[in-house]
Regions:
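Helix-to-loop junctions at the C-terminal end of transmembrane segments
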Residues: 38-52, 138
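Cytoplasmic membrane-interface "Motif A"-like loop-to-helix N-cap segments
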Residues: 49-61
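A membrane-interface helix-boundary motif in multi-pass transporters
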Residues: 134-154
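Hydrophobic core of transmembrane alpha-helices in multi-pass small-molecule transporters
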Residues: 79-94
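A late C-terminal transmembrane helix in Major Facilitator Superfamily
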Residues: 110-139
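Intracellular juxtamembrane helix-capping segments at the cytosolic ends
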Residues: 93-107
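C-terminal ends and interior cores of transmembrane alpha-helices
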Residues: 62-75
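Short amphipathic helix-loop junctions that connect adjacent transmembrane helices
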Residues: 4-23
Length: 168
């Protein structure tokens, strides 16, 4: 919900000029790249070693929620850079471990392609709905409402992950 609107958040919510927002987004991109590399390369292996999927996915959701919280409570460009770090790491961990979780919950390994295709549709629909929901929220109440809703979605992700009974 936040990623697609970074420029607008920096300009309209934080109050930066186009030039300052461009600099902040450049810094955010570097921060995100670094933490995403670290998170992607380490989280899957750690999850395998622990034999657990839910804990890393819940940690990832918590990191995302912290990332969303920071610009909501601190309207500064620095809070957006912190957002990039926390949310970038959270998204990387979530992406790596969630893929392993998806494979673990497949009902029939012989139909993995079909089942993963269905999971991909669900993921794509969520990514498509995010900007639509964000646009509606901004239209209703500005960016102040976007952050708590994003936090709520991260918390809901934790709750739904806990409902999966077939994996630890």
């Amino acid at each position: 919900m936040i990623l697609n609107y970074q420029l607008y958040i920096l300009e309209s919510y934080i109050g930066q000029s186009k030039t300052a927002a461009a600099v902040t987004i450049s810094i955010m991109s570097v921060v995100t790249m670094v933490v995403a590399l670290i998170g992607s390369l380490t989280s899957g292996a750690i999850s395998d070693k622990l034999g657990r999927r839910k804990i890393p996915v819940n940690i990832a959701s918590l990191l995302l929620a912290i990332g969303y919280l920071l610009p909501w409570v601190m309207k500064t460009s620095f809070s957006m850079i912190l957002f990039a770090g926390f949310a970038g790491l959270g998204y990387a961990v979530y992406g790596a471990v969630d893929q392993a979780l998806n494979v673990d919950v497949l009902p029939n390994k012989e139909e993995a392609g079909k089942d993963l295709g269905i999971l991909n549709i669900a993921t794509t629909l969520g990514q498509t709905a995010g900007p639509i929901v964000t646009s509606a929220l901004v239209g209703m109440a500005g960016y102040n409402l976007v952050f708590p809703v994003a936090i709520a979605f991260a918390v809901l992700a934790c709750i739904f992950i806990q409902m999966i009974r077939s994996v630890k």
